[in-house]
């Protein structure tokens, strides 16, 4: 993909900075950019200037008005402040350019319009590595599933993906172990020797697969998939809303899933455990009006328990043949679905009844978003001070202090003199 990199324009620099300043899912930041533009929004979010009355009125059209907006804005400023002094967007842009990548922004002609369906949950930009373009959603099929894939799951994935790629459809997944990796491999195998066309040619080149990652693209994650992700990059694209150096966390993985859903015309879940990120992706797809297909499996297999749960409880379609997966895609080459519903960033949940083979409870189950952000920012071996945690978690100092107290009560955080580290729980 080709986008400007020498002397980047103001919008690209601003959006590069914003991707480091705010965490995915920060709707107020996205609403400020939509109302005031990226450059002005950056100045306000970093505290370089104050929100003027006329700007408050513009923001109110996107984010609501009155005292509630004032409280949200004050909380946002406190949340963004710890990272505001550490922004260097030019450095980030140069770092990705040296790796053959860059930052795709909504102001670019190549920006995938399907992401606009996310509304206030839309990404502020997409960092990329690779030479392909993002196809319209009608020509992209997401294939997702469990990290603990069975031989049955890999076989089904290969059949679905091979048929899709041979039909000229791009396969989108998350680059993880299990079904994701099987999907990318099958796409590459089905399109040997393919090299993407130029980004400025108007129509998308023959991109067989796209991996949407949860961390910065300057390193490959998981490390065991470095060779695979390099192959995906050479034949297709690596995408992430996170800037160089950003670590993948559970919070970022969950928000990454909405991008997989939005970039695709439909989602196929091949295998999923009772609690699975693949179900989260399916929920995002349903909230965006995308079709979701689910592959059934043996009733004795925990790897298919989540699939059967979706088939029972969600408005999904059974996929019993590879051809049925392609039938999920909308006709035509235009954008898919309508504007995101107000719950687009919070996909529909399914009933919580646990089956006999339900996964064991995790120490982090039931944590709020803020608690999860702080918990994931805590190192395991070495203790860090609270100021460092405010930067890593992207939260205000008072919020981090309050959250640390709650985590300590749950046995998830341990104070070492005036520093903190992760506890085993």
Predicted regions and their residues:
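Glycine-biased, small-residue-rich flexible motifs in mid-sequence functional cores and linkers
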Residues: 1-11, 23, 98-101, 105-425
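Short, small/acidic-rich helices and loops at N termini and domain boundaries
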Residues: 1-108, 398, 410-419, 423-425
